[in-house]
């Protein structure tokens, strides 16, 4: 459940990304040491967590066995398909802002540490998770300047505690647009799509190109129509308000687009916007006392731009931030617990430490400063190890991993309640493998595993994002072993759909009266029962089945009436219908339906021999397996009688099992099927034989079973028994005995055929080869580039062909291929293939001249220019524009937009300006300049007309202050805010303005992007502060010295 206060209450950043092409130094440790923890298993399980968070239509073979389809009507309220995406946390709202941040962080981790994912056997799962969420973002981007950023309502969602599959509350869709801007979420979604495109490009270049196209549009949207999304989408403001503003996302999004496209214009944009990022209070020093999380990404951009450009100002900002987390800055340092946990904030403390750890590890790889390199590396390893169990409690904070892990995460679907109750059942019904909980919220290492504690035990997609990427980095350095049979499908914890019944009164000679209760406690996965039917079976005792009539005194499923139906011989039944009722595990009344019904027959009717009468009492409701329950025509509970004769004959004995595919940890068993002439074979029970002891290891409905998690070099014996529908069990089969391998499969696959190159272009080619064979089966191929004596894996595929991309024109390439089988054995390398890429096409044609610019939104310090777009026929495509200021005979470059519009800022009031524009293509050809546009900025207004709205969120001796300034006048307003604290409060850090405090007087001045407000326009600014125990609001506020209403 998301709290109703912000998770991050500072100006600062939260979004990480790594650039393709950044050269990094070798890992901090020259030779990988044995890992303290099995990082590969933790990474593998973290991928499971993201799968468990999926919304929408899930495939039949989905690895999370207890999840089903959900949210299938998302977007229907606005006529759009908004199915898919991730549920945010333990609730079921799809918040686009943290979802996009989480995707970007995961993509960064894949770009930085693909080998870590490969070693953990999780690269396919990572790509699948990124593609799944990218598909959702593409759906949500319904027009160039339109993006749906939230589905569901937090307040309504949090009032209900049940599984996602059976939600019934309204799920409204919320969007941003040109008239309702959201630069923060639009730029973050652009970053998510651009970074994901980098990861997915090698597998599907066309799909990656689609993601980049959407990312470009979204970034232009974010840059052109500026504003914080939570100002317009107020449904998000109580949960994921953009406290830091959108400046950080403009840097972050531009950087990622640069890495995805190679277009240096985006890098220049990132650097230009960087200079407007938040600073420490009353200082020009970039903020460093917080960290990267869903709201603010500036801390991640410190490291990214440092690694990309090497410029000292970025290096200084990154070092200062990470020093604050490690050794301290100017005597101040993030708080540490006695056990070594870095605790920045009470809500999701482990999340903040994990995010910082990932950046620290990546940044340390790049550094040449030996002291800081070791410091940041060791900090990252230490914080991740703390979460995995290296803490005073010797306990993991990752569900389903390590020693004493959390068992009660604050997660509705994993809990599996059918009563809309956070406490029932007491134990969670599912294991939410891989979920990182919030952990200790104070620097004292204290923690209680309680589902009701939605601070310490909350889980969320953004909690796992940096943590997952850090795990991939540690697997790359230290290794690890993924679990061979993970995940294992969970088995139902009892009856999911059933009928309870009792007698309402003693039977008479003409009727039987029964109280029946249909219950839906399903969670494997949860499901709605909308076509429920119940059959009560009776014997005819010499009369016709139609002589029995059905009636009901009380029914929660509507009127019940009818006559008995013959089932053949002396068997009949009456059917009660709940068709049209939504019986689902969603509450006390929602999960059940009660019917009190009566069967009336001829005089002298004896109910004692009726199959459904067996076991009924007058004392209490009890499960009645002889009263059958159906979903439509499908039997979901109970056993249908087979006439008046009871089946007491067991099935025939199964054949002796045969073991095949024996590996170090598993084997496949199969046997000749049993037969049963009575109620029919229901399935088989497999037993391990150890001396005179037989231990049940599993059941199956097929005459085969796959054994997993065996011990290498160990002898095993098994027998099989058959069981029929009536419950009769056959004799055991003869035993099969085999010994698992000690070193795995000794026969690798055959060597693949020599690759053949085709479709060779200047930047790519297709390779195909004759497939390998072997037993066990071939699972895939590694494609390796050969450079002298060095070979490097550049692609992996499950089919004998691969498409290469991103090659250099006019360059010779050599590749070879090797095969792998399911046991991990690798074949010899194939013979190599060598080919040379084609020369690049030459573009010498300049774009057409742009149209004459048109000035609009002219203010005191800014204006907007638009012009008719250029076209380019030379082949390299239009890359962007250069906007030049004209002063006499001098032309000065002032902006390089990628679209036919630019917002000018920092102009002087009451001053004439002239500008021209020229276009530039991908080959560097430049058009002639356009005709000039001339305009004069407005003079500064001296009498502002405004309103100020002030609100706070307080805790202990701290608080967050939020201020909305609105220009209610008719002319532009360049503002300076002033007020006085009445209770000794102090501003400690602010954002979206330059803050200062002298005594009790506080002053805030606008930044370049929000300093001037047009008529009717608003800006949100804010700060963190301290108070002595009383936090009285200021009496009044001034703008430019005048009292503001």
Swiss-Prot record:
Residues 939-1045 form the CBM2 domain. The active site is at residues 91, 410, 449, 458. Residues 493-642 form the CBM3 domain. It catalyses: Endohydrolysis of (1->4)-beta-D-glucosidic linkages in cellulose, lichenin and cereal beta-D-glucans. Residues 653-743, 751-840, 849-940 form the Fibronectin type-III domain. Coiled coil: none annotated. This is Endoglucanase B. The lineage of its organism: Bacteria, Bacillati, Actinomycetota, Actinomycetes, Micrococcales.
